[in-house]
Amino acid sequence: MKVLLGTTNPSKVKRFADLLKGYDIEFITLKDIKIIEEPEEKGTSPEENAIIKAKFYGQYFDIVICNDVGLYFKELDLEDLRQPGLNIRTPMNMNRLSDEEMIDYYSKLIAKLGGKVTAYYLDGIAVYNHGVISSFMDNEAAQKTGVFDMIDKASSKRFE
């Protein structure tokens, strides 16, 4: 079975391939079928944005899996404007950041927060299957199982 992954991110492709290993699935990416259009993600949660993307890419393919993620720092209140949340690449209403700009921005923010923060992701996943949407989202329990430390310096291994 062919499934479109609504992403151009190689890490997300690998993640889903690993998660669904053993199933008879051939993953197709947006690049494979030359889709360059992107939906406007106006959701208020990772799940809502995943649904928006799944419906949008469902125009091009019968079965689609989409994922959206929010990054959160325990040291910041959820309402704090510095909280990345859904705006990991566009913090504080900034223009979209490149990878290098994003590393620089978050390194400086984390330095201001003491040099180290406890971070966690909340994932939203949506599946479009011939016009029917199914979705789910991580909950606050992810804070206990999926936490990691971020420091104010980029890893030297990031290019490996």
Residue spans for each PLM region:
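Anionic-ligand binding patches
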Residues: K2-L4, S11-E160
